[in-house]
Amino acid sequence: LLAISVLTLALRTTAASISNASAVFVYNDEQSNEQFVFAYAVDSTGNDIYIHMSAPAGNAWMAVGAGSSMKDTLMLIAYASKNGTGMTLSPRIATGHSEPSYTDKVSCVLVYADDLENGNTVTNYGYQGSGLLGTMTVNAVCHNATTDQSKSPLIAGFPVGASDDMSPFIFAVGPGTVGNNNLQSNSLTASLREHDFYGQFSMNATAATAPTGSQAQVPRPNTANNNYTLANADAAYATHADNDPAPIIHAGVMCITFVFIYPLGAMLLRILNKVKSHAVIQCIGLVLTTMATAGGIVISSKYNKSKNFNSAHQVIGILIFLALWAQLTLGILNHRTFKKTGQKTTMGKVHLYLGPAVILLGWINAPLGFVFGGNPHACLPYIVILLAVIMIYISL
């Protein structure tokens, strides 16, 4: 009986043994001397993965995805929680080069342990210039995140040990603190700004998978000084610093057009009675507005909050765009009729009042766009410049 008890205890101890199997990827930024770290381990059942991920706190978010591209892949995206010191981990599905969408088919639970320093926190060491000095770190277990547990064969989940082949991964970080754009949210569906750095790497899934009968855990530091170093993974490749200028161009062109060009065209007609100059200036403005509108549509298609085109900024913008083309049509028809008859027309009256109304709507829509795009700080300088232009217009 004693022998049986000892054997039973031994079996339980074996079943509960903790595996140190893991793969660790580390990317060192030589310019900033900062690191992006991703380490993962797969449970012996193949159902769960345990992860450690960290990146500079100056970035809005950090992410890792399974596969060689964003096409139909599972991504784990982490960002600061609402209080600015904790972390939120959101599993999302990426369908291409657009903002990934949250999926409830994968559930992630944050893991806390005494030997995991600064786990699931944002450390703040102060500021340098416009950047936050510190590290954001997340430790978690994600259920149903592996390839063989994927609910859809089209979605690439995190690989489990099957061979010694290296499995591809992608990683990225969100934009920095310039303009106070850092994300702080408890929501798993929080809106993300486009990455400003991304790349690829490979990891050995077999080395990261716990042996049968053992329990995986969040990968611990693998150096004597309690840091992470590359293990069972290849160095980063195809890295790219990214800076999407499209939103800035869209906003800049629209502001220049509605604050300067359209009012200038109106003043040429009102003060100098220059009909042709008025028409040329307003047509230039319309061309610029059309280009900026097209750019806005492309930008909107990349983000979850804007792809349905139902925000106040987008709806007003589309109405303004249609009204501008109607204004051009009315202006041409009125001018042709007036040249023939010498009499004022109803079209001319509509044209007279529609123009200022559209410009006013454009002025109002700009701050809505700044707020919608996550740049409310731009509202103040915009309003100051706009008021100056209005005062000049009134004084003439």
List PLM regions with ranges.
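Membrane-embedded alpha-helical bundles that constitute the cytochrome b-like, heme-associated redox core
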Residues: 2-17, 203, 212-396
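Extracellular-facing/secreted segment signature in eukaryotic proteins
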Residues: 13-238
